[in-house]
Amino acid sequence: MSNATQYLSLKDTLELFSKSDDSLRAKIKAHLNQTKHKFIVLDDDPTGVQTVHDIFVITDWGKDWIKKGLSDERSVLYILTNTRSHNADKTENINREIVQNIVDVTKEMGINYSIISRSDSTLRGHYPLEINVLQDELLKTADVEISGHLIIPAFFEAHRYTIDNIHYLGMEGQLVPVNETEFANDSVFGFKTANLPKWIEEKTNGSVASDSALIISLEDIHDGGIDRVYEILLSANNNTPIIVNAKSYYDLDIVSLAVLKAIDSGKQFLFRTAASIVKSIAGIQDRPYLSANEIVSNDESQNNGGFIIVGSHTNKTTEQIKELMSKYPIEQIEINVVKVLNKETRMEELTRVCQLVDQNISSNRDTLVYTSRDLICAKDKEENLKISQTVSSSLVKVIRSLKVKPKFIMAKGGITSSDVATDGLDIKYAKVLGQAIAGVPVWLTGSEAKFKDTPYIVFPGNVGDKDSIAQIFENIKKDQKGEI
């Protein structure tokens, strides 16, 4: 972030158009209870549950698991696809298979639903691919014509806002356009503009012009309310992109009520969003952050060490683990990524790490495992994805090698936390307990997992302040022992 650049004040900007209405969320919930409409969230990494609680996430999209996930009265189900870590072909295949299974199961169960494609609040991920595939497959398998897809990257818990069609990150008290942050330089999903209409044109390689998008502005929301937003939604057809400006839950609650009204009128929508809209449109109320006792296993593993595993290579993550290591006595094990990427040295390096981790955990020593911080890049996106996958699979091997159950498990990074969940811990069905801190969800593993009934802290790579990992660690240690 350049010191010479003049940015909008975060505080001053958020105070403009500031409104609240605590009754809106209850109205959303009442509507869903009456209509029984469900939202099925296809989550491209496991961090998308970072605003919700008391809901379930499945990591297996077979028909039996989808049926189990839709069998209760909850209005939302998450399906972890992990497509952000896959190439375009695999991403397309996964989305098609899931839609086919959803269509079959919901037809059998008599459920009306909408699909949310939940992705990154910093605009990374397979857009427009996933939306286009969902539209095409719904038309083929269910004869559903999508009127439009709402683009809603707002994620308030991590200070991500969309104002005048520009998507911002709140950083150091200022609003910074997302294209001026490290996330825009992502080796796989990089982009050049934070102006969402122009971003659509950029990501579609010009096939969708910037002026073809419908806009729901803050003025529409605050001055026109539900009726004005509803009017805009009714004008959508043939999968029109619809950009939603939002800087508070009031804005999203108004949009959610208008969307539900439009659905009742026969409109069909897809959604490309970050995490905040799910909390709103599913009518989920606030709850306090989880206590340390809710984050730590309530069994004999309390006598074992906790385990933190870090794969994310963002600057934010590097700052966070440095802060943790400087503040608290925790065993530190660095995985040498160069050795992991070399077939001749990979096994020796992983054997070393696995032995140390198991010794530490069984001896009640909290342990941090992290990848070496030098980012290794290839010449193209496909090779960069392969590097990420190789590193992540190595972290999975560390988890799978554990012989004793840690008292808590935290994974840092989207790809890391997904692979740890599905391949390391063998999670198929988990309950989302809530959040440890803003934007950091906690799962409770199911009976099928490697370690059942274990709190699993899913920490996104792009979330939190410098001391956020240390803050969670401190909260756990204080509640467990009364001291650090």
Where are the language model's segments positioned?
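Gly/Ser/Thr-rich loops at beta-strand to alpha-helix junctions
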Residues: 41, 45-49, 119-129, 156-158, ...
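N-terminal short beta-loop-beta anion/metal-coordinating cradle
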Residues: 50-80, 352-365, 431-450
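Short acidic, glycine/serine/threonine-rich loops at helix termini
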Residues: 51-54, 126-130, 160-168, 253-258, ...
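Conserved, well-ordered active-site substructure
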Residues: 55-59, 405-407, 415-464, 468
